[in-house]
């Protein structure tokens, strides 16, 4: 699994990012050291996957747009670092299955719940992929918000990374007694996004 390579890269990148960026991490609680969970984050820039990895002590796997894997070298590198491809704008069953396998194997994975980067800086409508994996695996979902404070066009502007408490299967509105439905997935996605939005409003006030 290239675990040693992942954590060696993580240590190097932490040093680089501390020199380049100003960022604050807010943790609502200590996250589990064992067992699987899903990190559901908003998506502002190409540095977001790096900030997710830096702020979690455990190894993190994440979905990345399929286009990034067209370059064999770069695609191979990010695969070693935990990325797996997802086709945006499509119901990518293979990516969902890969995510479920990782969660069932006790891993931690990240999903950018909006399905892509925002062009305006505002939050977008959540996609259902995170809710689908949470429903199928019963894994808790950790809402996370990355907020740029100040001038959003400044790539080195201060960031606040806000990591929330895990939302349980029941807190997401899922039930063992019912077959999953699109409405159920939409409601779970809304609950997750509501937390992300709450963090964003709090953290935008941080000057």
Which residues does each predicted region cover?
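A secondary-structure boundary/capping signal
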Residues: 27, 64-65, 82, 112-114, ...
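A generic secondary-structure micro-motif detector
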Residues: 2, 63-64, 88-89, 119-120, ...
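Non-catalytic C-terminal accessory region of glycerolipid acyltransferases
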Residues: 94-207
